[in-house]
Regions:
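A solvent-exposed beta-alpha-beta segment
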Residues: 1-58
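Short alpha-helical
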Residues: 11-14, 68-69, 99
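Generic structural signal for conserved hydrophobic packing positions in ordered secondary structure
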Residues: 8, 20, 60, 73, ...
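Phosphate-bearing ligand-interacting subdomains
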Residues: 35-93
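Short hydrophobic segments within beta-strands
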Residues: 6-7, 31, 63, 143, ...
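Small/polar loops that bind or transfer phosphate-bearing groups
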Residues: 8, 61-65, 114, 150
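Structural signal for interior beta-strand "rungs" in well-ordered beta-sheet cores
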Residues: 86-167
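Short amphipathic alpha-helical segments
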Residues: 17-20, 72-76, 118
Length: 167
């Protein structure tokens, strides 16, 4: 049984939960500071409890859309010694030469071409196209259908809107 602790139970969390399930995680729980508005269960605590759940869960990831907040909790997970996975949807194409840092979430129908570098805790949303030799910094969120052209550089904590073109 693969266990996963997900930080955040808001509107993005069901997508991450489903993806984790597709990848073999069978025991998934959530920490959220507003459990009454959670989209997923079980919410077993708040973000103040991250360190205390380390003995029960060795693997954790952040499912928050806000880049700064996602990076804050990603760093806390690292500091607490959690293993932070990369979640790649089975329908995504990721080149064997791409370098994907921990905490990245790559959703359905994404294409990541040759020699791409993705920084920690970056989200590539449904249908994003990342061309060859692209560098995407840590904590970025590339939204649905966005295209990042060859050799482009996306600065850390950047949000690229749906259907945008980055050259």
């Amino acid at each position: 049984m693969q266990k996963l602790l997900i930080i955040g139970a808001g509107s993005f969390s069901p997508e991450v939960e489903e993806l984790a399930g597709l990848l073999g995680y069978t025991d998934i729980a959530f920490l959220d500071d507003n459990p009454s508005t959670a989209y997923c269960t079980p919410v077993i605590g708040t973000t103040a409890d991250i360190a205390s759940f380390r003995s029960q869960y060795d693997t954790a990831i952040v499912a928050l859309g806000n880049n700064n907040t996602r990076m804050k909790y990603h760093q806390i997970l690292k500091d607490c010694g959690y293993t932070i996975p990369v979640l790649i949807h089975p329908t995504a194409y990721v080149s064997l030469t791409a370098v994907i840092a921990p905490g990245c979430i790559i959703r359905a129908k994404v294409v990541v071409s040759r020699d791409v570098k993705l920084g920690e805790a970056t989200i590539l949303n449904v249908g994003a196209l990342i061309d060859h030799h692209v560098e995407i910094g840590y904590g970025c969120h590339i939204l649905m259908g966005a295209v990042v052209r060859n050799k482009a550089k996306v600065e850390p904590l950047t949000r690229v809107e749906s259907l945008s073109l980055v050259e």
